[in-house]
């Protein structure tokens, strides 16, 4: 393991540099560090060590020139007297040469010395340090050591080197704080020696350790040096995982800690690996040990590894071995993985089961029927092993001495195989035969099969034995009837003492009082039948009918061969009938029974002898003798009267052994394999347990065996003795009955080959199991406080501490069953298995609970539940409490979320109670905004909770991750509620009454939106107005669509990407727009369009203009399609020549941010260019823009039509004054064009509408200048509420014509209830625009690009203020306003029309609109031509020089001889031959009337330039377009439709004559009816000019004619005609008021009306006499009357039109002045007004009556004392 060791800090530079620029190169020699200074290589330090006082020590300083040039330098001697060198002198070193300079050191005392030698060169100075030091100790080691990460309670180490770099031998000792230690801690280092020190880090807790270790060194004087030791300790965290298949019941995705081996064959071992995962960053030493359990358990699980180290963030494979021993046993064990320090334990559970063979016989009996004596019969017997475990089987029969024999009586049956055995029947006597043969199987219970058959002879023909007889016999045996011979049973049957049941089995007569059913035969277990035979044990299933004694006998050594004593054999008849015993002769066997047959009376015995006749010495003999006993009456079938009385014979067997080995002769050594288990299978107390053993003979000789049963009487072994043929095997079954739980050892001596020396002791252990259940926590279960109504689940573990499966059942008191439950309540625990049960506590009150539960255990399943049964008590302690949940923030606003994107936040839930709460969250969604409620109600939930249910511990909080994903551009509101999870409310399907509001979350789904805020043009498109440009680019439709929600097809590719494989990419957008760049002649400047993109949304947006090439994927050449369509070729030509360009093509806009985009179209090729460009907003709209531009030939007349269809503004039917509307034409050519409108279709429409002029063209012909826009005026007057269409041909003289469809819609305002059409002057998306959008080279800008006056009454004045800003820093600009047409000049006024704006200055311009009396829709393009003042001055200067030169050339000339000769070649034929010739003429530049471009400027050739001085061209202006829109209405229409807006406008009242002439209705009627007026309206410009000139001449003559003036004056002074008195009173009053303003009266001329002194009226003295008082009162009254008359005169003056116009002009000029002053900063319109307190008025003694007249601001003061006033005066005052 590597450690990071930091080195010593660098020593200070011994050289003292005197100047900069020295480049030092370290030398490669380690003995002496060298440096290079300006090409001189020299040692940096000379050091003296080991010097003595009184002696000189000389060292040499070598200087070497490593430069390629000769170096010159000088030096200064050391400053002290202790270092001496030669006298300084100049040094010159050739390249590669060296110089040795001796330095002598002369010490005078013992101390350290230091000095230097300074060398000087032209480049600078450098020095060499001279140092002499005393011998001193010095150790060198790293300053800091970093140790690797270490686990707590573990250790890590690293090493470092300590080196003695001093001059003395030194000792060292380390002082190291815990948890670090050093090895060795102390030592001795000689000079130059070094040693390796190991640092050991042994942390006891997790921490970052940063300590200082101190090293003391030195002999006489102790010195110290420190080292920093850094290390970090972390806690290890280990987990166990079982790779591969998941355990049943395990949760997917989690680590598995249960290792399942499944079923493993008995006697085999299986290994599986588990992973120990180290989740920490440190290596983790750990111990693997078995969990503590009783010592009696035979460990079937084992692991060879007990200690290991798991690498950091790694894993360790651990092999576990499973070797089961007992078939059918389920094994469970636990291993614990404990890190060093026992910080935490990880438990690995291992389960497995043992499987053995599963052998079965296909039939339970083999029937040989009957054969004759001397014959044999063979039948087949199938034996199968359905398990995959090999099975050892053995039929317990000796075929050599039996009438039944098998071809393979023993063998191995492989897994899942079937073996067919041949069974042969060779009878020796004419009797019936039956033998029940046991088939022993190792690791399985024995199997039984019945062999039976009958033998007939000539004289004896017994009854044929059949399978039914065996069944009846077993039933009769149970009923105790087989001890009677068949003849007696027949008699009893005849006498009625016996009956037959339904199966024809015999039965005794039933007893009358007790109605019990007869006994039936039941199959006993094979083990019980095998052991309880009355021979091997004292117990028997049924009493024997015939017994033989002994059943086994060992003759021992029989030497000599002839001295073998016969064995007396006793056969006893236990029946009540006479029986016959017939022994099967064993031919060739050494054992014989005499006599072969014999009859035995009832209840009597008979003696037989077994003779042993060996034939060979030193041999082993073993055999089994077979005999059959039967009722003698069965010898002849005729003796049998009833078939049911037939009783099968009983088989008698004797096992015999003997040997003929001599006394001193060793027996054959047996070769065998013995498979014996170590322990008996576990059982309950006083229960039999069985196991099997296998003894295999692997030798070539027979083996005899004998088990000394008397040596271990507690264990039964069967068979006790026998023999095994070579290659065969013997299966033993052992049985014992343990009575207590103390382990008991059993030793069985097994003697082989009848020799005591070949005795094998079989050692087994047995132990009875008692019920033992381990409860966790000493039988106590604690619950945390639980909210009432809710439930809490706790894990509680119970463990089976026995080797047997244990059944358990929990019982809870009925009163506690509603509060407490357990799952599972009953079950089965496998041996040593621990089960975690789920206990649920559901309190119903706020109180503390102490509950009790009982678990009953037993070996049977289910466990018996009774007080006498073994049980364990469990105490449960819990508490009920109240609890609620609240949100930390009751309202959360996530703001704007991109539609389709995710945004998450954390919702903090707080639980302030003492109990944990399990909650269920529910969400309700509310979508609001401009949407259909029924449509959005079916939307899926746009809010997703990370988890909708969970648990919050007491006094804590939980975090719930909330993710929202809005699907619409609407406002979302989610109300989150919670319900406490109770048994009544298990899931989200709870009732609303259980829901509690928690919090509210809001979010707004938004799309990334952009819009076009402004657009302007330049280059060849500079003459296009902004409104026309807006329509050409379809920006209204584009902006309107950009505000909608994107279609799903537009989101196919959310971000700009290359997705097309062809040159023309597929279209996914539902909208396609035309981007029309207009038209221009070839070679013109490119048409530039500047668009201002604004992010009007609330989220950032990324946009891009994608050309077809930007959407195509890069493909290999072989994949490209070589056949290109004309459209593809056209697009490739456009892209290759870059006819269309966009800069920049992409960008990102933050909310509210703007960016200008420049689009251009180059006019390099004649024709129409089309290019589809995709405007893509990431996660938003995708719009296809069809870029279109037209290039025409020079001098070609071309009018650009924006579209072939024009929509007129809808007009209400019945409108008396329909407005004039405009259709625009743009001249994209270089010459003036004439257009003419063909009116035939309009005439047809008028004829179809009852001669009503629906469409009226006011300008049927006209001309358009190059690069400008022409207007065609239309009047649309619908007759019905419908849509009108008319196709109008527009002819271009000398050019192409176009058919334009004009569409107008008439509507009924009463039916629709709207007058909104009047209000729609501009489309909703047309705004004022942004002033930030400028074209390249623009020096000035307007504050507004569009002005909308809205709806205004006719003949009123409306003004707007526009500022012209000079954006240049240092150049003044000159501006001039011009309008597009004569009509615009009449209705629009601009003040000032021209001027100069200083740098960074601005000029206010007032735009005034005054309709001319004809209702119209005004759309004017005001153009402000801006020039740089410097360029104009330069132009004027150049022009003056050109004019002076022109004048000079007019009077000066030069005469040459050459001119005389050239005179004859003059071009003019009529020219006179002159001797003299003038200078080259001065002439104007031939300028074509077309837009100038960089490719079209006519440059003069050098030859022409030398002869012609071209007139200077004026500078090209910068055109600033100002669009003015308005709609004028007649006064009646405006008042009826815009009543609230009417008071805002000043309506000038014309005179009577003007009213009669200018009245709109009269004028409109005359215009509509008078054909001459229509002809005048359709007149050409030249005709109108003629009429205008004639009228000007007439009016001028009238104004200059004095006689006309006198006649007019006389007509005004004529008396009033007599008939003028015949008029209405109101008219007379009106005329009187109108005359009052002009005719003076006596009252108005009276000078007494305004008699005042110092601003106050004179007051009458109160001290006058009473008569004077009355006179004064009358005078005061007259004064009041005079004031009243004066007031009436003022009111009449105010009603005059001239007065109103004057006031309006004053107010307008005042407001304009205020705005101008405010723009200059001299007036602050938003400042707070100042309040000035006026002094109080002086007190007057005379109380006055104050009254104020209506409509006047003057006041009259009348004396309060009115006692002397007459009633008439009072009444006049009241009036």
Curated annotation (Swiss-Prot):
It is a single-pass membrane protein; Single-pass type I membrane protein. The chain crosses the membrane at residues 84-104. It is found in: Cell projection, Cilium, Flagellum membrane; Cytoplasm; Cytoplasmic vesicle, Secretory vesicle, Acrosome membrane. Pfam families: ASH (PF15780), HYDIN_VesB_CFA65-like_Ig (PF22544), Ig_CFAP65 (PF24291), Ig_CFAP65_4th (PF24507), Ig_CFAP65_7th (PF25249), Ig_CFAP65_8th (PF25248), Ig_CFAP65__9th (PF24816). Keywords: Cell membrane, Cell projection, Cilium, Cilium biogenesis/degradation, Cytoplasm, Cytoplasmic vesicle, Flagellum, Membrane, Transmembrane, Transmembrane helix. One of its GO terms (biological process) is sperm axoneme assembly. Residues 1633-1645 have a biased composition (Polar residues). Its main location: membrane. InterPro entries: ASH, CFAP65, HYDIN_VesB_CFA65-like_Ig, Ig-like_fold, Ig_CFAP65_10th. Residues 1331-1460 form the MSP domain. Expressed in testis. Residues 1627-1672 are annotated as: Disordered. Disruption phenotype: Loss of the expression of CFAP65 in testis which is associated with an inversion breakpoint into intron 3 of the gene may be responsible for the infertility associated with the Rose-comb trait. PANTHER family: CILIA- AND FLAGELLA-ASSOCIATED PROTEIN 65 (PTHR46127:SF1). Belongs to the CFAP65 family. Plays a role in flagellar formation and sperm motility. This is Cilia- and flagella-associated protein 65. It comes from Gallus gallus (Chicken).
């Amino acid at each position: 393991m590597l450690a990071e060791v930091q080195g010593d800090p660098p020593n200070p530079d011994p050289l003292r540099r005197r100047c900069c620029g020295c480049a030092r190169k370290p030398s490669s020699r380690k003995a002496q560090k060298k440096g290079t200074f300006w090409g001189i290589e020299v040692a940096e330090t000379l050091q003296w060590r080991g010097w003595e006082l009184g002696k000189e020590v000389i060292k040499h300083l070598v200087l070497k020139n490593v430069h390629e040039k000769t170096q010159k330098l000088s030096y200064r001697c050391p400053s002290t007297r202790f270092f001496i060198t030669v006298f300084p002198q100049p040094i010159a070193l050739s390249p590669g040469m060296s110089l040795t300079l001796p330095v002598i050191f002369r010490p005078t005392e013992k101390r350290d010395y230091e000095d230097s030698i300074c060398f000087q060169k032209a480049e600078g100075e450098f020095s060499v340090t001279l140092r002499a030091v005393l011998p001193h100790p010095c150790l060198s080691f790293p300053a800091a050591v970093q140790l690797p990460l270490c686990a707590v309670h573990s250790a890590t180490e690293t090493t470092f080197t300590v080196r003695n770099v001093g001059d003395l031998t030194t000792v060292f000792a380390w002082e190291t704080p815990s948890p670090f230690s050093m090895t060795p801690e102390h030592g001795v280092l000689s000079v130059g020696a070094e040693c390796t020190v190991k640092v050991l880090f042994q942390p006891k807790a997790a921490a970052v350790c940063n300590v200082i270790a101190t090293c003391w060194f030195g002999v006489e004087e102790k010195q110290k040096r420190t080292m920093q030791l850094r290390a970090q300790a972390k806690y290890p965290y280990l987990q166990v995982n079982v790779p591969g298949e998941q355990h049943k019941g395990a949760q997917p995705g989690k680590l598995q800690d249960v290792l399942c081996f499944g079923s493993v064959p008995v006697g085999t071992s299986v290994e599986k690996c588990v992973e120990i995962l180290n989740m920490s960053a440190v290596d983790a030493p750990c111990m693997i040990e078995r969990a503590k359990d009783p010592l009696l358990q035979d460990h079937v699980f084992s692991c060879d590894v007990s200690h290991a180290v798991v690498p950091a963030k790694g894993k360790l494979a651990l092999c576990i071995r499973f070797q089961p021993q007992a078939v059918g046993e389920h094994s469970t064990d636990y291993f614990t993985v404990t890190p060093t320090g026992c910080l935490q334990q990880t438990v690995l559970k291992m389960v497995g089961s043992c499987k053995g063979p599963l052998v079965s016989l296909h039939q339970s009996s083999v029937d040989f029927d009957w054969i004759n004596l001397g014959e044999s019969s063979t039948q087949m017997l199938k034996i199968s092993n359905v398990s995959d475990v090999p099975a050892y089987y053995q039929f317990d029969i000796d075929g050599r001495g039996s009438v039944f024999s098998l071809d393979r009586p023993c063998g191995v049956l492989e897994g899942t195989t079937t073996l067919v055995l041949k069974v042969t029947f060779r009878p020796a006597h004419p009797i019936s035969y039956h033998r029940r043969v046991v088939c022993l199987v190792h690791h399985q219970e024995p199997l039984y099969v019945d062999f039976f058959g009958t033998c007939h002879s000539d004289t004896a023909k017994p009854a044929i034995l059949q399978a039914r007889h065996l069944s009846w016999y077993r039933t009769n045996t149970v009923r105790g009837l087989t001890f009677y011979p068949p003849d007696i049973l027949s008699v009893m049957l005849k006498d009625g003492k016996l009956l037959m049941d339904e199966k024809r089995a015999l039965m005794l007569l039933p007893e009358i009082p007790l109605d019990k059913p007869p006994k039936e035969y039941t199959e006993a277990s094979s083990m019980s039948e095998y052991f309880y035979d009355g021979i091997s044990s004292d117990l028997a299933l049924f009493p024997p009918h015939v017994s033989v004694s002994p059943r086994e006998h060992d003759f021992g050594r029989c030497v000599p061969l002839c001295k073998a004593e016969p064995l007396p054999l006793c056969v006893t008849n236990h029946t009540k009938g006479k029986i016959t015993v017939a022994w099967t002769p064993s031919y060739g066997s050494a054992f014989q029974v005499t006599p072969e047959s014999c009859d035995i009376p009832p209840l009597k015995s008979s003696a037989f002898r077994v003779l042993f006749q060996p034939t060979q010495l030193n041999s082993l003999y073993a055999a089994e003798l077979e005999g059959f006993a039967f009722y003698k009456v069965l010898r002849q079938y005729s003796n049998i009267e009833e078939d049911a009385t037939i009783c099968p014979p009983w088989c008698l067997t004797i096992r015999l052994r003997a040997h003929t080995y001599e006394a001193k002769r060793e027996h054959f050594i047996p070769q065998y394999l013995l498979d014996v288990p170590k322990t008996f299978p576990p059982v309950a107390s006083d229960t039999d347990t069985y196991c099997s053993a296998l003894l295999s003979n692997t030798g070539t000789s027979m083996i005899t065996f004998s088990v000394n049963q008397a040596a271990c009487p507690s264990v039964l072994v069967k068979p006790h003795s026998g023999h095994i043929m070579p290659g065969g095997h013997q299966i033993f079954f052992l049985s014992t009955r343990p009575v207590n739980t103390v382990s008991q050892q059993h030793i069985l001596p097994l003697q082989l080959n009848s020799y005591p020396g070949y005795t094998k002791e079989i050692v087994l252990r047995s132990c009875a199991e008692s019920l033992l259940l381990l409860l966790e926590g000493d039988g106590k279960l604690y619950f945390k406080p639980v909210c009432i109504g809710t439930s809490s689940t706790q894990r509680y573990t119970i463990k089976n501490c026995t080797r047997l499966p244990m059944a358990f059942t929990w019982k809870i008191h009925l009163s506690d069953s509603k509060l407490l439950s357990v799952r599972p309540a009953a079950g089965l625990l496998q041996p040593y298995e621990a089960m975690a049960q789920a206990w649920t506590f559901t309190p119903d009150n706020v109180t503390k609970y102490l509950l009790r539960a009982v678990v009953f255990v037993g070996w049977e399943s289910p466990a018996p539940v009774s007080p006498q049964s073994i049980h364990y008590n469990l105490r449960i302690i819990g508490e009920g409490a109240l609890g609620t949940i609240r949100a930390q923030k009751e309202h959360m606003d996530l703001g704007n979320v991109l539609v389709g994107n995710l945004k998450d936040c954390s919702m903090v839930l707080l639980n302030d109670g003492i109990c944990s709460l399990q909650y269920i969250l529910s969400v309700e969604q509310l979508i609001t905004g401009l949407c259909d409620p029924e449509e959005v109600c079916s939307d899926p939930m746009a809010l997703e909770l990370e988890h909708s249910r969970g648990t919050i511990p007491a006094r804590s909080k939980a975090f719930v991750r909330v993710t929202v994903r809005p699907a619409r551009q609407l406002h979302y509101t989610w109300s989150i509620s919670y319900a406490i999870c109770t048994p009544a409310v298990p899931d989200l399907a709870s009732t609303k009454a259980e829901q509690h509001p928690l919090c509210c979350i809001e979010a707004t789904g938004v799309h990334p939106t952009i819009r076009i805020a402004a657009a302007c043009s330049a280059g060849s498109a500079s003459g296009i107005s902004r409104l026309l440009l807006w329509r050409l680019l379809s920006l209204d439709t584009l902006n309107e669509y950009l505000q909608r929600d994107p279609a799903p097809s537009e989101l196919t590719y959310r971000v700009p990407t290359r997705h097309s494989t062809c040159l023309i990419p597929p279209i996914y957008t539902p909208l396609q727009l035309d981007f029309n760049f207009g038209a221009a002649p070839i070679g013109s400047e490119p048409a530039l369009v500047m668009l201002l993109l604004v992010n009007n949304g609330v989220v950032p947006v990324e946009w891009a203009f994608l050309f077809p090439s930007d959407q195509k994927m890069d493909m290999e050449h072989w994949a490209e399609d070589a056949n290109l369509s004309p459209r593809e070729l056209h697009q490739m030509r456009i892209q290759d020549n870059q006819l269309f360009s966009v800069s920049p093509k992409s960008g990102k806009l933050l909310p509210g941010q703007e960016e200008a985009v420049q689009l251009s179209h180059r006019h390099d090729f004649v024709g129409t260019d089309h290019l589809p460009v995709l405007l893509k907003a990431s996660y938003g709209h995708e719009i296809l823009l069809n870029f279109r531009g037209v290039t025409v030939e020079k001098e070609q007349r071309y009018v650009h039509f924006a579209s072939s269809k024009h929509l007129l503004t809808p007009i209400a039917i019945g409108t008396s004054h329909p407005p004039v509307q405009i259709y625009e034409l743009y001249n994209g050519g270089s010459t003036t064009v004439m257009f003419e409108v063909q009116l035939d279709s309009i005439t047809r429409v008028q004829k179809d509408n009852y001669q009503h002029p629906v469409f009226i063209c006011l300008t049927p012909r006209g001309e358009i200048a190059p690069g400008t826009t022409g207007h065609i005026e239309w009047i649309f007057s619908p007759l019905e509420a419908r849509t009108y269409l008319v196709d109008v041909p527009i002819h271009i003289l000398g050019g192409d014509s176009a058919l334009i469809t004009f569409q107008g819609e008439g509507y009924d305002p009463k039916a629709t209830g709207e007058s909104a059409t009047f209000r729609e002057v501009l489309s909703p998306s047309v705004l004022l625009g942004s002033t930030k959008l400028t074209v390249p080279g623009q020096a000035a800008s307007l504050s507004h690009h569009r002005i909308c006056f809205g709806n205004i009454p006719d003949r009123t004045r409306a003004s707007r203020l526009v500022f012209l800003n000079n954006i240049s820093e240092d150049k003044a600009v000159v501006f001039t306003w011009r309008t597009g047409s004569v009509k615009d000049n009449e209705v629009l006024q601009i003040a000032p029309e021209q001027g100069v704006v200083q740098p960074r200055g601005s000029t206010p311009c007032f735009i005034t609109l005054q309709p001319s009396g004809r209702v119209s829709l005004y759309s004017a393009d005001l153009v402000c031509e801006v020039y740089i003042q410097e360029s104009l001055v330069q132009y004027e200067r150049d022009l003056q020089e050109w004019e002076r030169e022109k004048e000079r050339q007019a009077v000066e000339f030069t005469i040459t001889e050459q001119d005389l000769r050239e005179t004859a070649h003059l071009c003019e034929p009529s020219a006179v031959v002159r001797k003299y010739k003038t200078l080259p003429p001065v002439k104007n530049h031939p300028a074509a009337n077309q837009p100038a471009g960089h490719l079209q400027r006519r440059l003069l050739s050098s030859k022409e330039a030398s002869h012609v001085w071209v007139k200077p061209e004026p500078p090209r202006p910068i055109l600033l377009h100002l669009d003015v829109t308005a709609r004028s209405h007649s006064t009646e229409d405006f008042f009826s439709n815009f009543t609230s807006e009417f008071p805002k406008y000043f309506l000038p009242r014309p005179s009577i004559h003007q009213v009669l002439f200018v009245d709109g209705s009269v004028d409109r009627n005359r215009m509509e009816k008078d054909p001459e007026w229509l002809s005048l309206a359709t007149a050409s410009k030249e005709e109108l000019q003629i009429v205008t000139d004639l009228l000007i001449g007439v009016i001028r003559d009238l104004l200059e004619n004095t006689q006309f003036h006198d006649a007019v004056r006389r007509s005004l002074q004529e008396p009033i005609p007599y008939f003028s008195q015949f008029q209405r009173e109101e008219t007379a009053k009106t005329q009187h008021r109108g005359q009052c303003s002009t005719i003076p009266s006596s009252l108005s001329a009276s000078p007494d009306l305004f008699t005042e002194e110092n601003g106050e009226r004179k007051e009458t003295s109160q001290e006058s006499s009473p008569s004077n008082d009355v006179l004064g009162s009358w005078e005061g009254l007259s004064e009041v009357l005079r004031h009243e008359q004066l007031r009436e005169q003022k009111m009449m003056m105010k009603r005059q039109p001239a007065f109103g116009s004057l006031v309006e002009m004053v107010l307008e000029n005042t407001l304009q002045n205020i705005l101008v002053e405010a723009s200059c900063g001299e007036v602050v319109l938003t400042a707070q007004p100042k309040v000035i307190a006026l002094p109080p008025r002086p007190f007057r003694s005379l109380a006055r009556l104050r009254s104020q007249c209506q409509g006047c601001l003057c006041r009259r003061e009348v004396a309060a004392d009115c006692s002397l006033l007459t009633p008439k005066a009072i009444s006049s005052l009241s009036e």
